[in-house]
Amino acid sequence: MQIIHTIEELRQALAPARQQGKKIGFVPTMGYLHKGHLELVRRARVENDVTLVSIFVNPLQFGANEDLGRYPRDLERDAGLLHDAQVDYLFAPTVSDMYPRPMQTVVDVPPLGNQMEGEARPGHFAGVATVVSKLFNIVGPDAAYFGEKDFQQLVIIRRMVDDMAIPVRIVGVETVREDDGLACSSRNVYLTPEQRRAAIIVPQALDEADRLYRSGMDDPDALEAAIRTFISRQPLAVPEVIAIRDPETLERLPALQGRPILVALFVRVGATRLLDNRVIGHAAPQITQERAA
């Protein structure tokens, strides 16, 4: 595996693969890799000739009072995991490599990015869309892989690619979970043992939402209220966002009527925000399928 730090070096390294018509699979990450990231890597390796992973903690997507400074970083550890996973290239730029001068160009996707998690984190998804579009321009991948745990992000990236005619296939990969159901996340490392035990309320709330919906609760306000009450049973958990939405458009639904719905949760446990979601209903939604730009 070759570790690359600069944009020009990466472009030079990928040039032979492009000339030979090889397909490039790309997995953008912020590092401190876990099982979910490695599943994205596995899919990319299976479906492409060349696999590239980026590790970049993007300051544009962190708010003033968020965890940019303490976000977990361990490049040596991550490089070892990616080497074992048989990744071809690791792109690990610095902030000065990616943003040599203050950015004046921003990619934003309102209103998709201003609701749900975006309501709690203003500007977050503009930062995500900006860095992902820049990485796509640098890498020029044939396919890019994103976890469905960050479902709103996946919808936004798909829409950005469609709107901007970026020639990359966006692949959503099912959420990978710990043995007790908690979604794998780099931020789980923040949790104390007590908080980690409490965090199981998040996937349990999704189970409860599924049960209630299947039992006939099809009023979105009632379902949101029931989920909030369920989470509030755990004193260490504070539900910040509970959203029932259309899984393709993220639009609010006046009535559910048995259709597939997205249940998105943004829950604070201690100082840690945990994100999780599930699509529930009677049929698989289009968003979970691979779609070409």
Curated annotation (Swiss-Prot):
Entry binding sites for (R)-pantoate: 61, 153
Classification via InterPro entries: Cyt_trans-like, Pantoate_ligase, Pantoate_ligase_C, Rossmann-like_a/b/a_fold
Chief place of localization: cytoplasm
Record: residues binding ATP: 30-37, 147-150, 176, 184-187
GO molecular function, one term: ATP binding
Record keywords: ATP-binding, Cytoplasm, Ligase, Nucleotide-binding, Pantothenate biosynthesis
GO BP term, example: pantothenate biosynthetic process
SUPFAM superfamilies, sorted: Nucleotidylyl transferase (SSF52374)
Gene Ontology CC entries for this record: cytosol
Residues the record marks as active site: 37
Annotated EC: 6.3.2.1
Subunit-level organization: Homodimer.
Misc. remarks from the entry: The reaction proceeds by a bi uni uni bi ping pong mechanism.
HAMAP family registered for this protein in UniProt: PanC (MF_00158)
Protein function: Catalyzes the condensation of pantoate with beta-alanine in an ATP-dependent reaction via a pantoyl-adenylate intermediate.
UniProt name for this protein: Pantothenate synthetase
